[in-house]
Amino acid sequence: MKFRPLGERVLVERVEEDTKTSSGIIIPDNAKEKPLMGIVKAVSAKIKDDKILKENDKVVFGKYKGAEIKLDSKEFIVLELDDILGVIEK
């Protein structure tokens, strides 16, 4: 299923964190905080035209921002451009 964000929005897939600590303790899903980083999967036409973000950019966003949605049994978050704090560059 394709999703096309409108306005100044982007579709982001969260980057999963390790489920095991350095000492070998496995962290259960209900004890983990959701990561505040993700990979951009789709951008609105306005953002694409302005060349601010592009697909596959790794971004950092605020803790209580965006709307969570499910597409093809995968979880994503739809964020306003202003909710994105920055891009992680390689």
UniProtKB/Swiss-Prot annotation:
One of its GO terms (biological process) is chaperone cofactor-dependent protein refolding. Signal peptide: none annotated. Its main location: cytoplasm. The keyword Cytoplasm applies. GO terms for cellular component: cytoplasm. One of its GO terms (molecular function) is metal ion binding. The keyword Mitochondrion does not apply. InterPro entries: Chaperonin_GroES, Chaperonin_GroES_sf, Chaprnonin_Cpn10_CS, GroES-like_sf. It holds the Pfam family Cpn10. Gene3D superfamilies: GroES chaperonin (2.30.33.40). Keywords: Chaperone, Cytoplasm. It is found in: Cytoplasm. HAMAP family: CH10. Heptamer of 7 subunits arranged in a ring. Interacts with the chaperonin GroEL. Belongs to the GroES chaperonin family. Together with the chaperonin GroEL, plays an essential role in assisting protein folding. The GroEL-GroES system forms a nano-cage that allows encapsulation of the non-native substrate proteins and provides a physical environment optimized to promote and accelerate protein folding. GroES binds to the apical surface of the GroEL ring, thereby capping the opening of the GroEL channel. NCBIfam families: PRK00364.3-3. This is Co-chaperonin GroES. The lineage of its organism: Bacteria, Pseudomonadati, Campylobacterota, Epsilonproteobacteria, Campylobacterales.
